[in-house]
């Protein structure tokens, strides 16, 4: 009965535009920032998130909901009377499903990806921050500085002489 009441507890989150989102407490607690506010009894009238837009907050809620749901399914499989190999198989299926979800989740435009990184950092959601930062790292991996500038629309503000000096100073990185 206590577990049932816990899953039904709802938290109100307010985006920077003032849009209100009602989310399950378990989902909101994925954010360490929100978790601390709830624990400090600061969530009674809703939690304002001035650094997170409604568009990004809805994506963050989608991510957190899926991960909470997946953990719940994995826990249920582990708690059941199923033999150990079946529980291991169920956990593997949940992990595979989450990997697929995560891979699809980060297939967004750069602006959204960067906003997700900022939101994950602000809300202190380690899994989301790791996922989004790894996505950016993968976008950079194996590219030349010129390709990276083009990918991220970065203006080269080095003169050719300054660029050559940086290359000389960091020669070890180009070997």
Swiss-Prot record:
Gene Ontology MF, one: cullin family protein binding
Matches recorded under InterPro entries: SKP1, SKP1-like, SKP1-like_dim_sf, SKP1/BTB/POZ_sf, Skp1_comp_dimer, Skp1_comp_POZ
Subcellular location field: Nucleus
SMART domains linked to this entry: Skp1
Single GO BP term: SCF-dependent proteasomal ubiquitin-dependent protein catabolic process
GO CC list: cytoplasm; nucleus
UniProt superkingdom: Eukaryota
Gene3D superfamilies in alphabetical order: Potassium Channel Kv1.1, Chain A
Keywords: Host-virus interaction, Nucleus, Ubl conjugation pathway
Biochemical pathway: Protein modification; protein ubiquitination
Region Interaction with the F-box domain of F-box proteins, annotated ranges: 117-175
Nucleus is among the record's keywords: yes
Assembly description: Part of a SCF (SKP1-CUL1-F-box protein) E3 ubiquitin-protein ligase complex. Interacts with rice black streaked dwarf virus RBSDV protein P7-2. Is able to form the SCF complex together with CUL1 and the viral P7-2 protein. Interacts with D3.
UniProt similarity note: Belongs to the SKP1 family.
Function: Involved in ubiquitination and subsequent proteasomal degradation of target proteins. Together with CUL1, a RING-box and a F-box protein, it forms a SCF E3 ubiquitin ligase complex. The functional specificity of this complex depends on the type of F-box protein. In the SCF complex, it serves as an adapter that links the F-box protein to CUL1.
Designated name of the protein: SKP1-like protein 20
Organism: Oryza sativa subsp. japonica
Gene assigned in the entry: SKP20
């Amino acid at each position: 009965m206590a577990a049932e009441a816990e899953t039904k507890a709802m938290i109100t989150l307010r985006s920077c535009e003032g849009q209100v989102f009602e989310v399950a407490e378990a989902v909101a607690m994925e954010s360490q920032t929100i978790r601390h506010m709830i624990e400090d009894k600061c969530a009674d009238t809703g939690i304002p998130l001035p650094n997170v837009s409604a568009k990004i907050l809805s994506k963050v809620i989608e991510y957190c909901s899926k991960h909470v749901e997946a953990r719940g399914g994995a826990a249920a499989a582990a708690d059941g009377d199923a033999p150990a190999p079946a529980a291991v198989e169920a956990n593997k299926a949940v992990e595979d499903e989450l990997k697929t979800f995560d891979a699809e989740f980060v297939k967004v435009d750069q602006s959204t990806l960067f906003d997700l990184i900022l939101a994950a950092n602000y809300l202190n959601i380690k899994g989301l921050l790791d996922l989004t930062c790894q996505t950016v790292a993968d976008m950079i991996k194996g590219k030349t500085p010129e390709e990276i500038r083009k990918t991220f629309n970065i203006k080269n503000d080095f003169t050719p002489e300054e660029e050559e000096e940086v290359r000389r100073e960091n020669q070890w990185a180009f070997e």
